[in-house]
Each structure stands twice: as C-alpha cells, then as structure tokens.
Amino acid sequence: MISMASDGTNHRFCESCSKQKRCFSCTLPAMNGRLLSDDRFQCNRCSARRLTPQQTRQLLTELRATLHEMYGFEATHKIVLRLISQKAMEKISNDTRSLGCMKVDINKKTFTQGRKERTEIKWTCTLYLLTDLPDIIAAKVMAHELTHDYLYHHAGRGNDPKVTEGICEAVSGAFLESRKFNGYLEAMKKNPDPVYGAGFRLIFPQLKRYGFKGILERYRSSFTPF
C-alpha cells in the first residue's frame, strides 16, 4: 500500500503496517507515537516538531509580518489566538477535518449627531488552531486563516466556497513555496477535494500571474461586503 503524507512524499507500507493508527498531522500510519488528551494520535516524527503555545504565538507574529511583506496584509490589528482540542474545533468549524478556523465578529453601532449619522464598526478576530501542530503544518494553516481575515476586512463574505477557499489555499501555497516547502505544495496541487483542491488549482496560477490585489479585483463579485 502506498500513502501520501501531508508533505507530498509517498510511503510504501505492508498490509499490517497500513492498519496502524494514522497520525493526525502527517496522515501516515505509525506504530510509535502518542495519544493526545482529545484522542488524536501523533507519530513520533511529528511529535518531535510540534509547537508549544509560546512558539505558536511567536510563529503567528512572524507569519503576519511575512504576509504583510508578500501581499500587504495588515500586521497590527488584534487577532486572538486560541489553541483548542479536536472536539472544540469540530463545534466551531462544523468540520471534522479542520486544523484551524478564523472567526470574525462584526458589531456595528450607529450614532446620531445632529442631522448626521455616524457608524462605528468593531471587529473581533479570533484564530482557532489545534494544539500540538508541527511547525510547517501550523504555518500552512495559519497562512490560510490569515487570508480569511484579510478577505473579511477587504472583500466581505464569500459567496463561492471554491473561490474563497481557493484564494486562502493559494496564499498558503505561495508562502510554502517561498520557504522551499515544495512537497507540501505538491500535496496541495494533488488534493482531490472539490472545494479546497479545485479552488487551489483554479486560483494559484492566477495569483502568480496577477498578484493578490489582481485576484481580488477579478473575483470581487464573489464577495458581499459587510
């Protein structure tokens, strides 16, 4: 049996080994590893690269600065990072496969001053991330979710999941490519998912050709401003 890991590498397993528990991080079967408190299994290789909460927060700061350099993403507005269990993630994202989820709450208040009305908008941005993610996977997921944050602020609510997720996957892929993590990029290109995989294959070549601002203009009609 041949299995592809999340880093795009292929691994051959005998029938017995292929039936072992699969690591939630790299998706490969493994005999040796550890069971997390929420029943996720993590192989020894991924466990050795897992980030502590402090390291995860530092990576988020560095990644925001990198995406600001690459595409002009804001790097200063407050984003709360919450490291949570698999069960909590399923409730927040409504997806059993999700490794991360960006939630943006918008509170609008309108004030009347004489004959004029003034509207204030308060944004509350929270990035939910699974605990114990290895460094590269954590960066990949956060780059995706930070793109959601940018789209919320500058485009609005996405009307076409393939376009919205495709843009987020494309930015994540561009970050991975900039760091020479080409195996992860290849895995994204081969992803059979009709939303994430197909969206990436649609948007990534256009991102390289037109740039991020060009992508926003081309797909502006796919979003509804808040």
Residues of each region from the PLM?
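A metal-dependent hydrolase signature that marks the N-terminal structural subdomain at the beginning
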Residues: 1-113
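Pan-zinc metallopeptidase signature
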Residues: 15-34, 193-226
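Second-shell loop/turn segments in exported
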Residues: 48-55, 128-132, 155-158
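Hydrophobic (often cysteine-bearing) scaffold residues that line and stabilize catalytic clefts
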Residues: 56-59, 138-139, 143, 160, ...
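Cys/His-rich zinc-coordinating modules
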Residues: 65, 91-102, 132, 171-172, ...
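Active-site recognition of the HExxH zinc-binding catalytic motif
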Residues: 67, 140-154, 165-169
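Active-site scaffold of zinc-dependent metalloenzymes
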Residues: 95-139, 146-153
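Post-HExxH zinc-binding segment in Zn-dependent metallohydrolases
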Residues: 154-196
